[in-house]
């Protein structure tokens, strides 16, 4: 299993101390006992590959959302190991560098707002690369009804295998139409977990029978919003505070 699907994130909630965690999609971790994390070392000293265990006996060491339709998982990391190995742990603070969907709308982020996707799509990045590919897209739908029904924000962006768990961040805007709001800093909007497929049906002209169904990437990515990420992180916090 490849680290490149995993979003690195920091956490500080409810007055609790900062804790290092990985946030990714549930489907990335399911069915595996371990994953390999590739993390940069400080001062450009190369890359470390680290085995991370996902199970203790039959129990998972990671946390998932109680709603089966939410494809989010949180894996705690050992902060002392990160310090000892001198790893460059650049991360999103889930409280201070992220905004839930309601806060985004209040800040002026809506349909058409530009966003970036950061990730390592398989086959598109050289294996020795330490920097992600950045792709530009825009918010396609950010409505309350959309999120309540599907648990997703829709983003017009091309995501590929290997982008599961990729962060979507807002693009800072310093110019806005008079009387409207604009968000002047990059904030985590959510994480990608899949895309809406486009199906094309081929029929035999003589029998009118379906002979083939092709599935293509429609270019609309499904993104779980920050509020759902925080709900999973809070499960982890309650476990270790209790």
Feature map (PLM): residue ranges:
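Serine endopeptidase catalytic core focused on the charge-relay Asp
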Residues: 1-2, 34-161, 165, 170-173, ...
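A conserved glycine-rich beta-strand in the N-terminal activation segment of trypsin-fold
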Residues: 1-21
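Residue-level recognition of beta-strand microenvironments
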Residues: 8-10, 142, 171, 194
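Alpha-helix termini
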Residues: 11-17, 173-182
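Cytochrome P450 catalytic-core helices
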Residues: 24
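Conserved catalytic cores of soluble enzyme domains
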Residues: 183-208, 214-221
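Terminal helix/beta-alpha structural elements that buttress the NAD(P)+-binding lobe
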Residues: 213, 237
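C-terminal recognition in membrane/secretory proteostasis and scaffolding
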Residues: 239-242
